[in-house]
Swiss-Prot record:
It comes from Gibberella moniliformis (strain M3125 / FGSC 7600). Fusarium verticillioides possesses 2 unlinked loci, FDB1 and FDB2, necessary for detoxification of antimicrobial compounds produced by maize, including 2-benzoxazolinone (BOA). The FDB2 cluster arose as a duplication of the FDB1 cluster with rearrangement and expansion by incorporating additional genes. PANTHER family: MAJOR FACILITATOR SUPERFAMILY (MFS) PROFILE DOMAIN-CONTAINING PROTEIN-RELATED (PTHR11360:SF224), MONOCARBOXYLATE TRANSPORTER (PTHR11360). This is MFS-type transporter FVEG_12626. It is found in: Membrane. MFS-type transporter; part of the Fusarium detoxification of benzoxazolinone cluster 2 (FDB2) involved in the degradation of benzoxazolinones produced by the host plant. Maize, wheat, and rye produce the 2 benzoxazinone phytoanticipins 2,4-dihy-droxy-7-methoxy-1,4-benzoxazin-3-one (DIMBOA) and 2,4-dihydroxy-1,4-benzoxazin-3-one (DIBOA) that, due to their inherent instability once released, spontaneously degrade to the more stable corresponding benzoxazolinones, 6-methoxy-2-benzoxazolinone (MBOA) and 2-benzoxazolinone (BOA), respectively.
Length: 415
């Protein structure tokens, strides 16, 4: 097939020909129950601040930051393989295996005491299980919605915001009372209950269609320029986004917040992120996902360079957590909708996973780079902030280029 013909086929999904049994319900009990189950599946939390202050206090923040960095890398790099398995076999076995691995990893973290043990449990095992839940959850929601797709995906993604809001508070409250081990076990049991709901409710509306195996299946998405530009945007934005998330707590302590209040910055960030995932999702269904993504990426860059960089106060740290949480939450929620817009439904798992694998390098290197920049600046955060701001700005530029390419340069168009 001619590459240009193939490109037009995948880049104009709004004009795809109807196929038998492929009408999108865009609502109803089954469709919204999938959203509820996917929401439960994305309920996760962040524990790095505790590692730095307690279990791994003898190690530098840069060294400890490899735990979330490797964790995100594993979740992203496995995307193409999990996505391909979803396209070929459906979500059922992936969700079951993911549940077992995710909970097992948290249980093993509860009895860990050495750095390598946290790497194995929290940076490899648990994220691998989480990936087997995350990609099928997003992909299944996509098969049930079209007109309300961005809203449905935003509600789904807000599950991680709620988890990120609640779990740090739970952890901070429980650790002094029952210790780190039982706190992690309590979180694992909580997630097990939620993941059972995910296993019972999340299903794809489209029957799996086994396709050819081999490296070509994973490289084909890169024959589309719109996919390449969108993936580059996600890569640079992710590089800029993960850094402030990783170092938000330590920065709060740096500007004078108490340990407990600095810990609540994560909850503030995630609560705001939840709003940023749902409200812009509703707007994106009206004006276009790419248009909303450009606006959100622009705001993120402004908040980074115009607020976090010049602000050196406790108030500015709190304000940044809230505002950046909102804008970055939009990115998290709308990214799957962007890929769905330029992809065939039957390949949504593979193409989504391939995009996230492209972002895995950013996930792996962003946090360690941030830690190294802090050390090179003598404990100051200004180099980290400038670097993150430049990455966010580059991501914004590539979102604009992707949008202009898709619309053939037309400015006032829903896309």
């Amino acid at each position: 097939m001619d590459p240009d013909t193939e490109q037009m086929r995948v880049e104009k999904p709004n004009h795809e020909q109807p196929k038998p049994n492929t009408e999108f319900p865009d609502g109803g009990f089954k469709a919204w129950s999938v959203v509820v189950g996917a929401f439960c599946g994305l309920f996760v939390g962040v524990f790095q601040a505790y590692y730095e202050a307690n279990q791994l206090q003898d190690l530098s923040p840069s060294t400890v930051s490899w735990i979330p960095a490797i964790s995100m890398f594993i979740m992203f790099i496995t995307g193409p393989f999990v996505g391909r398995a979803f396209d070929n076999y459906g979500p059922r076995y992936l969700l079951l295996a993911g549940t077992l691995l995710h909970v097992f990893g948290l249980m093993m973290a509860s009895i860990s005491s050495q750095y390598y043990q946290y790497i194995l449990s929290q940076a490899i095992c648990s994220p691998l299980g989480a990936a087997m839940v995350l990609y099928p959850s997003f992909s299944c929601v996509t098969t049930w919605f079209r007109q309300k797709r961005a809203l449905a995906l935003g509600i789904t993604a807000s599950g991680s915001s709620l988890g990120g809001t609640i779990l740090p508070i739970v952890v901070n409250r429980l650790i002094p009372r029952i210790g780190f081990g039982w706190t992690m076990r309590a979180c694992a049991f909580l997630l097990l209950g939620l993941l059972l709901v995910t296993n019972l409710t999340v299903r794809s509306r489209v029957a799996p269609q086994p396709k050819e195996a081999g490296i070509i299946a994973y490289l084909r998405p890169f024959t589309s320029l719109s996919f390449i530009l969108t993936s580059l945007a996600g890569f640079f934005y992710s590089m800029g986004m993960f850094i402030p998330i990783t170092f938000m707590v330590t920065y709060g302590e740096h500007v004078g917040l108490s340990n407990s209040m600095a810990g609540y910055l994560v909850s503030i960030f995630n609560a705001s992120s939840g709003i940023g995932r749902i409200l812009p999702g509703y707007i994106a269904d009206k004006v276009g996902s790419f248009n909303v993504s450009i606006a959100a990426a622009t705001l993120s860059t402004i908040f980074m360079l115009g607020l976090w960089l010049p602000g050196h106060s406790r108030e500015s740290a709190i304000a940044f957590a809230a505002l950046f949480g909102f804008s970055s939450g939009t990115y998290t929620a709308i990214s799957p909708a962007l890929i769905a817009h330029i992809s065939d439904l039957e390949e949504i798992g593979t193409r989504s996973g391939t995009m996230y694998a492209f972002m895995s390098v950013a996930a792996l290197t962003g946090s360690p780079i941030g830690g190294a920049l802090i050390s090179s600046a003598g404990g100051s955060y200004w180099k980290l902030q400038v670097f993150a701001g430049c990455m966010l700005g580059a991501g914004t530029v590539f979102y604009v280029l992707a949008r202009l390419y898709i619309t053939k340069g037309r400015l006032w168009e829903k896309v």
